[in-house]
Amino acid sequence: MTLVLAGFGTALPEHRFTQAELAELHAGFCRIDETRERTLKALYRRSGVKTRGSVILELADGPLDARQSFYHPARDEHDPGPATTDRMRVYAEAAPRLATTAAAKALASADVAAEAVTHLVTVSCTGFVAPGVDAAIIEGLGLPRTTQRTHVGFMGCHGALNGLRVAHSFGDGSPDHVSLVCSVELCTLHFSYGWDPDMMVANALFADGAAAVVGRSANGSGDEWRVGGMGTFLVPDSRGDMTWRIGDHGFRMTLSARVPELIQSQLEGWVVHWLAEHDLEVADVASWAVHPGGPRILTSVERALGVDRDHSEVSREVLAEHGNMSSATILFILDRMRRLDAPRPCVALAFGPGLVVEALLIV
């Protein structure tokens, strides 16, 4: 069965930070001197992010310290911030609501009734709870209680593409199979305290959001977005360059300065080989949906593949407006490109711990 991406839905927290507000908040995590504070604020200005949604915000306006109560200023240089158990408590409350909203929008966009869903794939790397987001979606939207569930957990920013691979594998020839893939990420629950370069980069980029897509069998319409293929590549000698680990005070990311260099040096050879398996060359790809791990990641992809900056415009827009929402981000980008009627074939690329490249071909 050819999987068709029949409808997308997205959801964001009610309130948002500006990047300048977050720089001020995070400066309070570090108890830093004026020199380091200038360095931190410069990093935030260069991040490509303008605003970010966060479930920790309780009010839209007013003084920053009155709008949220989850994070406190560091008491001293050894203060690690909220415990992971406290962060997971917020995840358990907020993630199901956000995911259910995105899933409902995707079903409406695809004009698919909730009772028609046969398979549900949930994706998240920013929290754990059981019963989980899947059960909340089934009960909240009235999906059949026989819906087959799979959770793709802790795979990082490319997780939604792994989720689509799972949905694609459900297509065993039955035209009645309808898959709902839903990603929800609450990255702002993992803001880190202290002065650590990797943590500073993560604090400057990541945000909250949820996105969903409905997959069904093709009906022969020429305007359908069909999955033409998927691929994956574990970059050699890169195990320590991007990591995501559970700590006592939040999940902690390692993001080395080598990541853009690795992408620029390793991506082209694999993409050329993968596209050839589908009788395509890089020049044949009409549009690109690239996960914006940050501005340098986008630039590295453009240089590696020899494509114009214009091909990353939607990715940069999503990064600026919403920040890096981990695995949900690529679905935000695909949703926007589909609404813009982006030309095909389209290739989606996302990167995660490993370092791993995941790819999706849409025809």
Region locations from a protein language model:
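Condensing-enzyme catalytic core mediating Claisen C-C bond formation in acyl metabolism
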Residues: 1-90, 191-265, 269, 341, ...
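Short beta-strand segments
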Residues: 6-9, 123, 153, 178-185, ...
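Active-site-adjacent elements of ketosynthase-type condensing enzymes
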Residues: 24, 129-136, 181-201, 231-247, ...
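Conserved beta-ketoacyl condensing-enzyme motif
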Residues: 43-142, 282-298
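Short, well-ordered amphipathic alpha-helical segments that serve as non-catalytic structural scaffolds
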Residues: 45-49, 94-110, 210, 262-277, ...
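Glycine/charged-rich beta-loop-alpha catalytic/anionic-binding loops adjacent to active sites
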Residues: 82-83, 114-119, 141-153, 193-198, ...
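Claisen-condensing/thiolase-fold acyl-transfer catalytic domains that form or cleave C-C bonds
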Residues: 90, 100, 107, 125-127, ...
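Glycine-/small-residue-rich "gating" segment that lines the acyl/pantetheine channel
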Residues: 144-165, 172, 186-220
